[in-house]
Amino acid sequence: MNFLQYAIWGSWLISLGAYLGGGLDFSGLQIGSFFATMGIASLFMPAVMGIIADRWIPAQKLLGICHFISGAFLIAAASQTAYAPLYSCMLLSVMFYMPTIALSNSVAYNALDLARLDTVKHFPPIRVWGTVGFIAAMWFVDLTHIGGVQIKLTEWQLYVSALLSFVLADYSFSLPGCPVERSAQKQSWVDTLGLRAFALFKEKRMAIFFVFSMLLGAALQITNAFGDSYIQNFGSMPQYADSAIVKHSVILLSLSQMSETLCILLIPFFLRRFGIKKVMLISMLAWVLRFGFFGIGDPGSGAAFLVLSMIVYGVAFDFFNISGSLFVEKETSREIRSSAQGVFMIMTNGFGAFFGSYAAGAVVDAYGWPDSWFIFAGYALVVAVVFAVVFKYRHNPAEMEGVKHLSLIHISEPTRLQ
């Protein structure tokens, strides 16, 4: 299940930008809008589907329904070449895909509970197969040709994703049943959607943290949207036309996912040694390097910089998401802890990704390559400097006990706002 769950996403998330820009000649702002759809969906769809799974439809069945609908819209999207209908179909597909990340986790947890297995111990090795699936799908669309053209450069990547969606939709109905609580105590929509946790903005430190979560969240989708397209642009230069990096750019970009998986193992040590604030600062500086190396790199003598950009991605993404989630865990009361985690995700993967994707597209249209990468790097550096000055936090190593387990649990989070 986890393999298919993320293979569906890996089939198009990294390569769609190159198809939109190179195959359909969309502008940077238009390309950014496609990746902003994930921000729109993250604002409310996971919560709505979570309510439905809790109250009315078992999670495994709802998982199948969502994947079927998402796959249907992917097929519709694949047949479109004009911006408006293609965007509309992708938005609707993403609206039904994003909730499946949380639903698949719930289904997995339920299956482990039924088998009387410890979720902390047994779930991470299962979830790793999601990353394997994501990378495998990236390699497939990069290495497979239809009509002499790589799938990653055509609408066929959406057909591949749709096929995988239908396979998982069918398989979901065979998974162990998840309970529903039809007689659960009624709550207001404010409580059900976790909106009461927004009261945390009244606390200065939490408000500062959430604002910076949004500011850094703006960086999450930039390389997903434009990384492959940028590398493909080198193919128009005679000296790089036959470069393996250009021809297999998605395989190069898959190093980012490999780095992400490995960097998770470093987080417990860094959190205990340096504390949350410094770890978050390391993440922000890693984003500076991520973008800067992209700007310096090229498929020739600068290939090493492109590889370094992939390697630092794991630090940039993991160190912020997991340390940020831990900060929320420590600073909030048990009654609103889950809702507060939801606010953190909304600020990063919702508002941050939405505004960041559109802003990045506008920058690309205005300044082109490689200047845009240096602008993104400068933005990340400014955010890091201001965060270091404004955010007040005193590290207490004793509070970091149990971090190892927490970091492993967060492998299950929707990490591809990568």
Describe the predicted segments one by one.
Residues 1-39, 207-212, 217-237:
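Helix-loop boundary and gating motifs at the non-cytosolic
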Residues 68-81, 286-299:
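C-terminal ends and interior cores of transmembrane alpha-helices
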Residues 3, 73, 83-101, 214, ...:
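Hydrophobic core of transmembrane alpha-helices in multi-pass small-molecule transporters
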Residues 143-163, 362-380:
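A membrane-interface helix-boundary motif in multi-pass transporters
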Residues 409-418:
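Single conserved hydrophobic/aromatic residue that forms the stacking wall/gate
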Residues 93-129:
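Cytoplasmic helix-loop-helix junction between adjacent transmembrane helices
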Residues 44-58, 145, 263-276, 364:
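Helix-to-loop junctions at the C-terminal end of transmembrane segments
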Residues 177-210:
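Juxtamembrane intracellular "pre-TM" segments in multi-pass secondary transporters
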